[in-house]
């Protein structure tokens, strides 16, 4: 048996020797089919060819290229064109794409992109060749999914976005412009006049009017909330006096490092807040400021306090006081150690308070009407409307209520009790001093009586003094808990 295996082993060794000397078996790839695999895209992936029966990966050292990174893209343009792709981008090893285990490799020689002289590689497993080309333009409708937040729909109207520094202001920052599916910042030159353009941008963002350009030191610190820097410059100013956004800018090649357009609009938030402390009331004292709610109050340092009253007039209005009465810088002996400084001008236009470590000079401001201003227009109108409503109610409901009260009082006066008034059974009469027996023919309705017991009903056998007769009857009989008197029963019910 061992003697039979020796010729086979010798034949195998001879085949390996021939392969190593000749570079492998020659593979016929006439009428080849070419594809890119491992990426899911037909224009990027591992380069593979087929002769109609089997697919082969192309060796990364094909065509004698020791460094494929230095290959000019035009040299493998033909490969991209045969794959029905656009311009070539990269030809390199396929380490970035998924490899297929035990796939056969071919190594080709001659002109780059030619498969006329290829042989099967039987050496150790090496990287295959990868090709990346530009995708062809889409001919189908765009997907219905919404685009990323940084890039609007191609059909969306032009728009702006302000990118502020972390924790920065609203309506202030670096301007990003989006139009036709392209988004980026706007490059400017020092000589550019952006006042009119700034008005257009602030109005489009509903941020009021243009206030001033964003200082370069702050512009360099701006970054997106996600932690990314603003987009690269892709636009430049074409017409600073434009009235339509489409006419303002033109596209440029993306570049980083230039100065991008940044601005501050008048409606920036939060605004600087002020108060007066150390005086007799809230309308008098030295000025303190802070940059929004939740921030600490500190002294306003102002060395230019004698240049105008506009800043102090605004401070008085914010305290809901009258006009400024006087203002003065405090004596040098009263200087504080530090505080906040803001450039000259009204505080509502000061977008950032700068800290001053020393030599901070305070300003003492006195406003007119040291007490709080009177009621506002809204409160006065509310009081007037309330008084008018009360007058209408009195006119409409007053007479009716008066009549009801008078009627109730008269009824109470007429219903006075005639009969025993206490435990001693004393008599109480509400009658005239004399009683006149009226004839039956007299018209009872023609005479006025003071109460309903002035005379008995007609054709009645009841006495004119039933209460008196009842009292005499009780005296003559033994007292008990029962009573035959209608008046006593009536009295008990009333009590």
From Swiss-Prot:
GO biological-process terms attached to the record: apoptotic signaling pathway; T cell costimulation
Compartments, as annotated in UniProt: Cell membrane
Residues on Extracellular side: 24-372
PTM notes: Phosphorylated on tyrosine residues by LYN; this creates binding sites for PTPN6/SHP-1.
Transmembrane segments: 373-402
Membrane topology: Single-pass type I membrane protein
Primary localisation category: membrane
GO cellular component terms listed in the entry, alphabetical order: external side of plasma membrane; plasma membrane
Residues bearing the modification Phosphotyrosine: 453
Residue ranges, Cytoplasmic side: 403-495
SUPFAM superfamilies: SRCR-like
Subunit (UniProt): Interacts with CD72/LYB-2. Interacts with PTPN6/SHP-1.
Glycosites: 51, 117, 323, 369
Domain SRCR: 34-134, 160-266, 274-368
Signal peptide: 1-23
PTM annotation (Phosphoserine): residues: 439, 460, 483, 485
InterPro entries linked: SRCR, SRCR-like_dom_sf, Tcell_CD5
Amino acid composition bias (Polar residues), ranges on this chain: 475-484
Name used for this protein in its record: T-cell surface glycoprotein CD5
Renumbered residue ranges of the record's region Disordered: 475-495
Intrachain disulfide bonds: 43-85, 80-133, 108-118, 202-265, 242-248, 283-321, 301-360, 316-367, 342-350
Keyword field: Cell membrane, Disulfide bond, Glycoprotein, Membrane, Phosphoprotein, Receptor, Repeat, Signal, Transmembrane, Transmembrane helix
Function (record text): May act as a receptor in regulating T-cell proliferation.
Gene name for this UniProt entry: CD5
């Amino acid at each position: 048996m061992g003697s039979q295996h020796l010729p086979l082993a010798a034949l195998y060794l001879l085949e390996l020797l021939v392969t190593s000397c000749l570079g492998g078996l020659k593979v016929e790839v006439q009428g080849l089919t070419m594809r890119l695999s491992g990426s899911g895209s037909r224009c990027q992936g591992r380069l593979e060819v087929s002769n109609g029966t089997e697919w082969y990966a192309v060796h990364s050292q094909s065509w004698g290229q020791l460094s494929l990174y230095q290959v000019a893209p035009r040299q493998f343009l033909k490969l991209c064109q045969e794959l029905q792709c656009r311009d070539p981008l990269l030809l390199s090893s396929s380490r970035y794409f998924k490899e297929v285990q035990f796939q056969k490799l071919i190594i080709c020689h001659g002109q780059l992109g030619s498969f006329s002289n290829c042989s099967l590689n039987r050496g150790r497993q090496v990287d295959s060749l990868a090709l990346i080309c530009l995708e062809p333009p889409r001919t189908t409708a765009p997907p219905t999914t919404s685009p990323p937040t940084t890039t609007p729909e191609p059909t969306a109207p032009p728009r702006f976005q302000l990118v502020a520094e972390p924790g920065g202001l609203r309506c202030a920052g670096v301007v990003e412009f989006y139009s036709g599916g392209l988004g980026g910042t706007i490059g400017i030159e020092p000589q550019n006049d952006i006042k009119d353009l700034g008005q257009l941008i602030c109005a489009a963002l509903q941020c009021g009017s243009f206030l001033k350009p964003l200082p370069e030191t702050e512009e360099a610190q701006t970054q997106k909330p996600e932690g990314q820097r603003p987009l690269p410059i892709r636009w430049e100013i074409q017409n600073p006096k434009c009235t339509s956004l489409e006419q303002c800018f033109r596209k440029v090649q993306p570049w980083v490092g230039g100065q991008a357009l940044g601005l501050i609009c008048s409606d920036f938030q939060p605004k600087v807040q002020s108060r007066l402390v150390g005086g007799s009331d809230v309308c008098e004292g030295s000025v303190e400021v802070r940059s929004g709610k939740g921030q600490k109050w500190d002294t306003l340092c102002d060395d230019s306090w004698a240049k105008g009253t506009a800043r102090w007039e605004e401070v008085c209005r914010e305290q809901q006081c009258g006009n400024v009465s006087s203002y003065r810088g405090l004596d040098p002996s009263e200087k504080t150690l530090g505080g906040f400084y803001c450039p000259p001008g009204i505080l509502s236009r000061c977008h950032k308070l700068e800290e001053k470590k020393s030599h901070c000079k305070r300003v003492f401001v006195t406003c007119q009407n040291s007490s709080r201003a009177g009621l506002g227009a809204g409160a006065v109108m509310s009081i007037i409307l309330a008084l008018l409503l009360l007058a209408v109610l009195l006119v409409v409901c007053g007479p009716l209520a008066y009549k009801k009260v008078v009627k109730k009082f008269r009824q109470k006066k007429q219903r006075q009790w005639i009969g025993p008034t206490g435990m001693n059974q004393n008599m109480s009469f509400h009658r005239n001093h004399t009683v006149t027996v009226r004839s039956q023919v007299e018209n009872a309705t023609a005479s006025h009586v003071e109460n309903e017991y002035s005379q008995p009903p007609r054709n009645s056998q009841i006495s004119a003094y039933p209460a008196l007769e009842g009292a005499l009857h009780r005296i003559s009989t033994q007292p008990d808990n029962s009573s035959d008197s209608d008046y006593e029963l009536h009295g008990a019910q009333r009590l």
